[in-house]
UniProtKB/Swiss-Prot annotation:
Pfam families according to UniProt: ACP
NCBIfam families, per the entry: citD, PRK13253.1
Chief subcellular location: cytoplasm
Entry's Gene Ontology cellular component terms: cytoplasm
Full protein name: Citrate lyase acyl carrier protein
Protein origin, superkingdom: Bacteria
Keyword Phosphoprotein: yes
Function in brief: Covalent carrier of the coenzyme of citrate lyase.
Organism, scientific name: Shigella boydii serotype 4 (strain Sb227)
Subcellular location: Cytoplasm
SS bonds (residue pairs): none
InterPro entries: CitD, Mal_deCO2ase/Cit_lyase_ACP
Length: 98
């Protein structure tokens, strides 16, 4: 999936996450995580994000994640909504990502 434009998903409310994405000129993934629970769950947050990006074959992006103690399922949902917005695809290719 190609990321064509910057996008934002989520809020800064307690129990939620705000994720910002922007395309890069390289194929790197620049991941910046700011979390109130990073010491306890930082590795799990990073693993979840990289798993979703790999599932949709996303490369060449900068991600800024402001986590306020969100659950894993919400993190995945916010990230999938973000990818749809940033790629310009109205619906994600669910069949290809199972």
């Amino acid at each position: 999936m190609k990321i064509n434009q910057p996008a934002v998903a989520g809020t800064l409310e307690s129990g939620d996450v705000m994720i910002r994405i922007a395309p890069l000129d390289t194929q790197d993934i620049d991941l910046q995580i700011n979390s109130s629970v990073e010491k306890q769950f930082g590795d799990a947050i990073r693993t979840t994000i990289l798993d979703v990006l790999a599932r949709y074959n996303v490369r060449g992006v900068q991600l800024n994640v402001d986590d306020k103690g969100t659950l894993d399922c919400i993190l995945r949902a916010r990230l999938e909504a973000l990818l749809a917005r940033a790629s310009g695809i109205p619906t994600l290719p669910w069949e290809d990502c199972q």
